[in-house]
Amino acid sequence: MSVKTKKFVNKKYTTAKFKVTPTGKCRNKNNESIKKLIFNNGTKINTGLNLLLTQPNQVNIPPPPKILLDRIREERKRMVSSANSDITVIDIELCWEIDKFLAHHFQNTDSSKNDNYTKSNIKKPINAFIAFRAYYSQLGAGIKQNILSSILSEAWNSPETDQNIWDIFAQQFNFASARCGFVNYIMAQASSAP
């Protein structure tokens, strides 16, 4: 009994099976407009791209808005003068000396927490308001969360708050995929700035 085998012949087709007609203008690979890009300080101008500033020119962390400091001061006075003497008020100096206050608290961070980093710990990207809230909520230590949240949102919407700077900080943090929190990341960036 013989087994039949099939042989496949490799046919070379010389005619196209279908035809494609472009609907618009075809882009030339040597487009003159691409060659004429204007560069200014290392960034492209008029390219239609969103550029992420990974190393901005000395963007400093802005001091807290005056309305934020005033409202926190009022809330602390209200907490002290209230009849609830069992509430412990943490007295944070309101003159906002970043180098002395925050550097002291974040100097001895535990690096062993970063060793246990897994895919399940990946966080959602933060926006500008979340960055603002995370950084300045430290000033309201001891104040109830719901009161502090309303104070921070009022400060965020005040005209003296530059929201674009916080947007840059949030984009940098999201791009870097830092394993630490936002406040630790931004303090490390501020201390390493030239």
Curated annotation (Swiss-Prot):
UniProt cross-references to InterPro entries, sorted A to Z: ALPHA1_Saccharomycetales, MATalpha_HMGbox
A GO molecular-function annotation: sequence-specific DNA binding
Pfam assignment, any one: MATalpha_HMGbox
Main location: nucleus
Protein keywords: Activator, DNA-binding, Nucleus, Transcription, Transcription regulation
GO cellular component: nucleus
Leader sequence residues: none
DNA-binding region coordinates: 121-177
Subcellular location: Nucleus
A Gene Ontology BP annotation from the UniProt entry: positive regulation of mating-type specific transcription, DNA-templated
Purpose: Mating type proteins are sequence specific DNA-binding proteins that act as master switches in yeast differentiation by controlling gene expression in a cell type-specific fashion. Transcriptional activator that induces the transcription of alpha-specific genes.
Note: There are three genetic loci for mating type genes in K.delphensis. MAT is the expression locus that determines the mating type of the cell, whereas HML (containing HMLALPHA1 and HMLALPHA2) and HMR (containing HMRA1) represent silenced repositories of mating type information. The mating type is determined by the MAT locus, which contains either a copy of HML or of HMR. Diploid cells are usually heterozygous for the MAT locus.
Family note: Belongs to the MATALPHA1 family.
Name of the protein: Mating-type protein ALPHA1
Species name: Nakaseomyces delphensis
Gene: MATALPHA1
